[in-house]
A protein has these predicted regions:
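Bacterial Sec-dependent N-terminal signal peptides
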Residues: 1-18
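Extracellular/oxidizing-compartment recognition motifs
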Residues: 17-225, 241, 257-259, 301, ...
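Non-catalytic C-terminal accessory modules of carbohydrate-active enzymes
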Residues: 24-25, 31-34, 44, 48, ...
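Active-site acid/base region of carbohydrate-active enzymes
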Residues: 126-127, 169, 178-214, 219-221, ...
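Conserved small-residue packing positions in alpha-helical repeats and bundles
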Residues: 291, 362, 401-402, 433-434
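Alpha-helical repeat scaffolds
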Residues: 410-418, 450
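Repeat-solenoid scaffold signature
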Residues: 421-460
Length: 586
């Protein structure tokens, strides 16, 4: 009997088996199990109904239910349309989710299918918005990458699942005239990776605790079949976006196959000599991610699998940098969206990113025994350093130059990054601005900026971090979890920029998670010194915190640290590490 007839498949490293009915026979070998889990989550509150007479007994939708349709109308929410009066209800599921909606329905009138409109929204406003056919205008939503505004028929005395997107709010409109539907349940269907949060962070400031967890949850939602940039859009593997996400995964979950799968997929989709995602900067991020991922997991076999791609990429870069340090990798230079108008600054940051990538590329080649390519990386970097550009007051560029060692971190912070505090920070490159501040010893300022900038999103109702955020947007903005009062700005519909105006703006974007790994690295002070976390340095920086504690996942187990500030400012640390891990201090 072939394995297929036994009806049991072992999926990845998961111990649970997947049983396939024997009738599939050899066809079972062509099936693909769903590696994600599902949760049914009832609404946390009824935000709004069009009229109490049109939507009755709505409170039953807040119950967890059992998912089973029942004939009739007992203990159900009834929605009526009378003439031109449409029955509508807006549900709040309490936090950002990835997945869809399940409707469990009773009897309809007239009996049979009824037409409804279902709108998903990451904000109240988006769930009540109109789409503009993809013209990307502020104040309008889109169905780009995921359907979030759907008109469809639903059954009587049955159930149906609708949608696959990122959302917190759902609006349901009954469209048929003189019609009735009865909703027994309307849970969200959350699709996610069923994995433990091995890393943790707690300190004396609850705001920082919330920020750390929000970054962790933001990335967790984006760990779908592959590692996405955002769960509403683009739902794509972008290598550059992955760097903060992978940093967060290492701090929160440890090893996860989604990283390997996503890197592999990107290399398959964009074989050399193409740049990854068609962007030369994202090929640079590939080298940086590979080195940091190896240092955490110590998986040399995975690096060997990518040997040809790594060395081939280095050859491509080498062919684009002449002896005078002029480079011609690509005409398009992209760091992040907010930096785009500052072309001179982007040029300086781009070259700094390339130097950082080449430094990690040389280390990768040494590990692989590719001494010639390691030397080639160093030679290319040497040529680039003949022309060190100025950051042109761009915080993104100054941060990369500080991280890459092309600019003294103290100067980068004093002259550019620290100017105005959180002003001109960005959700993606804010991570590297924080890294530059840490390198300059400005830990307190970094904590203050985290509280103000990332905390500013929480103040506006965020439960995950956004694709973009400008503090200026918040001056007169209403929260995302309520209707916008007259005279207030809509934080979702009125803002956004570049390719994400208005409601196209993603409110769950993994590249915004930087404070999570940053606080693990610099507040808890956990630094990986040897591949596979074999040696860890613990050097905390509490700033104005009284204490901090947390855990960090390694291939050998979870490390626990606790730091308490005593009278006089001295910090007393407790460190517990698994066997096989050497812990050193300052």
């Amino acid at each position: 009997m072939v394995l297929a007839l036994l009806g049991a498949l072992l999926v990845g490293t998961v111990s649970a088996q997947i049983y396939i009915p024997p009738v599939f026979g050899k066809d079972s070998l062509d099936t693909r199990p769903d590696e994600l889990s599902r949760l049914y989550i009832p609404p946390k509150r009824i935000m709004w109904v069009s009229h109490d007479s049109l939507v009755q007994n709505k409170e039953v939708l807040l119950l967890s239910g059992n998912g089973q349709p029942e004939l009739g109308k007992r203990n159900m929410c009834s929605m009526y349309t009378c003439g031109r009066d449409t029955a509508s209800i807006l549900l709040d599921y309490g936090r950002e989710l990835h997945g869809g909606l399940k409707l469990v329905l009773g009897a309809a009138r007239p009996w049979g299918t009824q037409l409804v409109r279902v709108r998903f929204g990451e904000s109240v406003s988006e769930a009540c918005s109109e789409h503009d056919g993809g013209r990307r205008r502020k104040g309008y939503s889109t169905n780009d990458h995921a359907m979030r505004d759907i008109t469809m028929k639903v059954p009587s005395d049955g159930q149906i699942e609708i949608g696959n997107t990122g959302f917190r709010f759902v609006r349901i409109d009954l469209l048929g005239s003189d019609a009735v539907i009865r909703l027994k349940e309307a849970p969200a269907v959350m699709r996610y990776r069923n994995i433990p949060y091995l890393g943790s962070f707690r300190c004396s400031d609850p705001r920082l605790n919330d920020i750390w967890m929000t970054g962790a949850y933001t990335v967790h939602l984006n760990m779908q079949e592959y590692l996405w940039d955002g769960i509403k859009r683009d739902r794509v593997v972008w290598l550059g976006d992955m760097h903060p996400e992978v940093s967060t995964i290492m701090a929160v979950f440890g090893y996860n196959e989604v990283v390997d799968k996503s890197i592999d997929l990107a290399c398959e989709q964009f074989p050399l000599p193409q740049w990854l995602n068609g962007m030369s900067a994202y090929s640079m991020w590939y080298l940086i991610i590979q080195y940091e991922w190896y240092m955490h997991n110590g998986n040399l076999d995975y690096l060997r699998k990518h040997r040809d791609y790594i060395t081939g990429l280095i050859d491509c870069i080498d062919s684009c940098v002449d002896e005078e340090g002029n480079e011609s990798l690509a005409k398009s230079r992209f760091l992040d969206w907010p930096s785009t108008p500052n072309e001179a600054g982007v040029e300086a940051g781009y070259r700094a990113l390339l130097c950082w990538a080449l430094d990690d590329g040389a280390k990768l080649c040494d590990l692989l025994g590719e001494k010639g390519h390691a030397a080639k990386c160093n030679a290319i970097a040497g040529r680039l350093k003949k022309q060190i550009k100025q950051p042109n007051r761009l915080k993104q560029a100054a941060a990369l130059m500080a991280v890459a060692g092309l600019m003294e971190s103290e100067r980068a912070c004093d002259e550019i990054i620290s100017v105005g505090g959180a002003k001109d920070f960005s959700t993606f490159y804010g991570y590297y601005m924080l890294q530059a501040l840490a390198k300059a010893g400005e830990y307190q300022q970094a904590l203050d900026i985290i509280r103000q900038y990332w905390g500013g999103m929480l103040d506006l109702g965020a439960t995950t971090f956004w694709e973009d955020f400008n503090l200026d947007w918040s001056r007169n903005a209403a929260r995302l979890d309520d209707f916008v009062p007259e005279g207030k700005d809509d934080i979702h519909g009125d803002f956004g920029d570049y390719c994400y105006p208005g409601f196209r703006h993603s409110f769950c974007h993994g590249w915004a998670s930087g404070p999570t790994p940053w606080m693990t690295r610099h507040v808890l002070g956990i630094e990986v010194l040897d591949a596979g976390c074999k040696t860890i340095r613990v050097n905390p920086h509490l700033g104005d915190l009284e204490w901090a504690e947390g855990t960090y996942p390694t291939p050998l187990g979870v490390i626990y640290v606790k730091h308490v500030k005593k009278d006089g400012g001295n910090v007393v640390s407790t460190v517990k590490a698994p066997d096989g891990i050497k812990v050193v201090s300052k």
